[in-house]
Amino acid sequence: MNKVYIVNILPLLNQEVYDYYYARVGEQRQKKADSLVSAIDRARSVGAGAVLRFAVEDATGYSYDSLDFGIDGNGKPYAEGNPFYFSLSHSGDYAVCAISDSPVGVDIEQERQLSAPFRKRFARDILEWTKKEAKGKLTGKGFFDESPLECYVFTHQKTDGYIVTVCSDRKFDELLYYHLPMPL
């Protein structure tokens, strides 16, 4: 089980949709969302929780509601008992979740609008940034972790204007798009 899920969080800017998904993410995710000032940041946070819920149920067969989630001393979220590993990230209009049977880190970054001469160089910088962020999430030591690490790096650049990088000792092959079902 090595999957990466991505969701567009813009539907969460609608209050009814936001409330629906807010009620379905864990208490820790709700508290995090409540601490944020802007609606878009709250939508990103709840979007990360929503894509985690879907990934858990789709990839593992576990019921999201049957699991307890925690945050370790480095701020890395985990499922109690480690039945699987996951990593979350969000940027711009998207939230992503990588889920695996081994430790994993993921990062997504939105490419900024740049003039043509700068775009190629900056895209490389963004790619390196996402690799470093994903590695830091994998190890739980953060962005400034300078330790050497052998891992597969899966980078996806087909999501318009975004780069997604996964770091793991397992191979990831594709990015799975998940669309938030609208509440009835």
Regions found by a protein language model. Give the residues of each.
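Core catalytic alpha/beta fold that binds nucleotide/phospho-ligands
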Residues: 1-184
